[in-house]
Structure formats: structure tokens, C-alpha cells
Regions:
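Conserved HGGG/HGGXW glycine-rich cap/lid loop of the alpha/beta-hydrolase fold
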Residues: 16-74
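Active-site loop/oxyanion-hole signature of alpha/beta-hydrolase fold enzymes
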Residues: 53-57, 63-102
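Conserved hydrolase catalytic core segment
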Residues: 101-139
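Helix-rich cap/lid subdomain of alpha/beta-hydrolase
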Residues: 130-192
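Active-site nucleophile elbow and catalytic-triad environment of alpha/beta-hydrolase enzymes
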Residues: 185-200, 215-217
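Short beta-strand/loop motif that positions the catalytic acidic residue
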Residues: 204, 210-212
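Conserved alpha/beta-hydrolase "acid-adjacent" motif
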Residues: 217-223
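Catalytic active-site module of serine/aspartate enzymes centered on a nucleophile-bearing elbow/loop
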Residues: 232, 237-259
Length: 259
């Protein structure tokens, strides 16, 4: 069972409040920073599946922010306040506020894009783990929009009556948002500002692990991504975009790689 949780917050570079959770004691290794995916928050992505427990069991200190527009962090409805580049700047402020000279960084899906951007621009990342992304990072820029077109996600999050939606990947985002009580206007703002540019993957100096579910439509051909990062290893897991996190090897591989 997780113990030692401390909730903290800070005003980011544009005065949006970012809330983060902190567990564990300072060690000789850098803290592990966990960045969650779209719609969910730190609890849903990292606490509930046991990732935080696994890291604490290995003696690590863990920091897990709720991204802007998600969880307990600030939720402006202006699309100009969003995008993974802005979230990467939030990570930089988190390190400045906590005084951490170096971190191990783990990101999933949207959080993987944030983490790749951050690691490509910063030298404060010792080791990097990204999951739930694949060739789309290079071929689309950011999260792969070929499997689930972005406009369908915006529509699914915007309609008043979700029963009018058919079964689709976009509908699953609406179901998840409603289950978590998420601010759908904030999520639409983020979806409207999704990162679409090139990421300087060859500038990533951290040793990197790419994790992908075999049946994840958002992480097709992950070898294309791992081969574009100078010092990267690819590990395949069972399951789709959500199911891969439940694979016991997901948590185990993160702990082992960051040791």
C-alpha cells in the first residue's frame, strides 16, 4: 500500500497551477517523474495500476504531476493555454521548484510526447521511458492521429448526449472522461492544441526505453521511434493502449530500466 504521499502545487510559467504528488525519500538516484496521458490523471495512470507502488518498493522517490487541464491542476478553457510543448515547460518549472538537477522521466501517450519534447531540449534527464506511442511521433508529429482522428475526439468530448456516439476509439475517451469527472471543455482545448511538429529525437542524450502494446493502434511500428533515438531499447508488451499498462512487465521493466 502506498504511504508517505505529499500533495504540493506551484504556479507554472504562465501562472497556471500545477498540482503534483510526491512519495518516498531522497536517495542517491534521481527522483522518478511520471507524466500521464490524455484525459486521465496521475492517480489513474500511475497509482491505480501499481506503477508508483512498484517504484516505491524499489526504494525510489516519485513525483507525479497532473498535467494542465487534468486532475487537480488548473483547467483554463483557452486552447492557447495547452499543447504538449507547454506541458514540457511545466516539467521544467517542476524541476526548478523542487531543485532537482536530474530526473528519470516516464511518460505515457500524451505524456510520452511531453517527455520526448522535454528530453530533446533538456539535459536534466538521466533515463527516459516512453510508452503508448510509436511511428506516429515521426510520421504525424506527436500522438498518432491516424488511428483516432483528432476531430472525432473533439466531437466525442463536446456532444451533450454521449449515447448518440457510436462505438469508436474516440468514444472511449468520452466514457473515460465522464467516469473520471473530467473537465471536458479543458480536454477539448488540449485536443485542439495537440502537438503536430517535429521532435528533435536525435538530441535526446538519455538512455531510453520504448514500451508498446502489441495491439495498441496508437503505438504501431514502435521500432521506427526507438531506432530514431540515439540510445533506445524497445520492449513489446501484451495488450492495447490501456491493456499494456496492466501487463506485469510494464511496471517491472520501468523499475529495472531505471535502476
Amino acid at each position: 500500500m502506498i504511504t508517505g504521499l505529499v500533495m504540493k502545487s506551484f504556479k507554472s510559467w504562465d501562472q497556471i497551477e500545477i498540482v503534483y504528488q510526491e512519495w518516498g525519500e531522497q536517495t542517491d538516484l534521481p527522483p522518478v517523474v511520471l507524466h500521464h496521458g490524455f484525459v486521465v490523471d496521475a492517480n489513474a495512470n500511475w497509482v491505480a495500476p501499481g506503477i508508483v507502488d512498484a517504484l516505491l518498493g524499489a526504494g525510489r522517490r516519485v513525483l507525479a504531476p497532473d498535467a494542465r487541464g487534468h486532475g487537480q491542476s488548473g483547467k483554463p478553457h483557452d486552447p492557447d493555454s495547452y499543447g504538449e510543448q507547454r506541458m514540457a515547460r511545466d516539467l521544467a518549472v517542476l524541476l526548478d521548484v523542487t531543485g532537482e538537477p536530474q530526473i528519470d522521466l516516464v511518460g505515457y501517450s500524451m505524456g510520452a510526447i511531453v517527455s520526448l519534447i522535454f528530453a530533446s531540449e533538456e539535459e536534466r534527464v538521466r533515463r527516459l521511458v516512453v510508452g503508448g506511442v510509436g511511428s506516429g511521433v515521426i510520421e504525424c508529429g506527436g500522438v498518432d492521429r491516424r488511428a483516432i482522428p483528432n476531430d472525432t475526439i473533439i466531437e466525442a468530448l463536446s456532444v451533450d448526449d454521449p449515447t448518440t456516439l457510436g462505438k469508436s476509439g474516440a468514444t472511449s475517451f468520452r466514457v473515460l472522461a465522464d467516469a473520471l469527472g473530467a473537465d471536458r471543455e479543458a480536454l477539448v482545448a488540449q485536443a485542439s492544441s495537440i502537438y503536430r511538429g517535429e521532435i528533435g529525437l536525435n538530441g535526446i542524450s538519455a538512455r531510453t526505453l520504448v514500451l508498446a502494446g502489441e495491439d495498441d493502434p496508437l503505438a504501431i511500428r514502435p521500432n521506427v521511434l526507438s531506432e530514431a533515438i540515439p540510445d533506445a531499447t524497445l520492449m513489446m508488451l501484451t495488450g492495447d493502449h490501456i491493456g499494456a499498462i496492466a501487463d506485469p512487465d510494464f511496471a517491472r521493466s520501468i523499475v529495472d530500466f531505471l535502476a
